[in-house]
Amino acid sequence: IRDLYVTGVQTCALPIYPSAYRFPRGLMERESLEFSFSGLKTSLLYFMDDFKESDSMTKKDVIASYQQAIVDTLVEKMKRAIDKTNVKRCVIAGGVAANKSLRESLRASLPEIQILFPDLSYCTDNAAMISFLGEIKYQSGDYESLDFGVKPNLKLA
């Protein structure tokens, strides 16, 4: 299970029971848009240390439950962001956008919002997309000096 990556989790999780085990949903008690998956990852590691596969719960059930905890968190935080901003259209990109369960849950939970997903062939690691954009900007001469101060608490919006 520790070797699974983005689409590996999705592939293993289908079509099993995503509520077989209740993994934590981090930072849900706060009204903020922040989220953290560190407790979820730790919970899975501890769970798997003691896990014994049985007729009532398989490793696929565990992975499906783990995936559901991630999807639930992302959907809830997205709902909160929509409530705060009143946007009517949103793009979901990066590797996580390839997850079928996330796509379905977002569309079902936010029917009033136009949610756009790139074709699966474009749902890759954000670092690659950012690097590519950086190369395009650099080649076109669109870049800034590297002489600036560090602002660790700089707001994104």
Question: Which residues fall in each region the model found?
Answer:
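A contiguous, well-structured pocket-lining segment that forms one wall/lid of small-molecule binding clefts
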Residues: 13-90, 99-110, 138
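Single conserved hydrophobic/aromatic residue that forms the stacking wall/gate
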Residues: 1-12
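Claisen-condensing/thiolase-fold acyl-transfer catalytic domains that form or cleave C-C bonds
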Residues: 101, 122-139
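Surface "functional belts" at beta-alpha junctions
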Residues: 97, 114, 155
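Short, conserved micro-motifs enriched in small and acidic residues
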Residues: 4, 65-68, 121-126
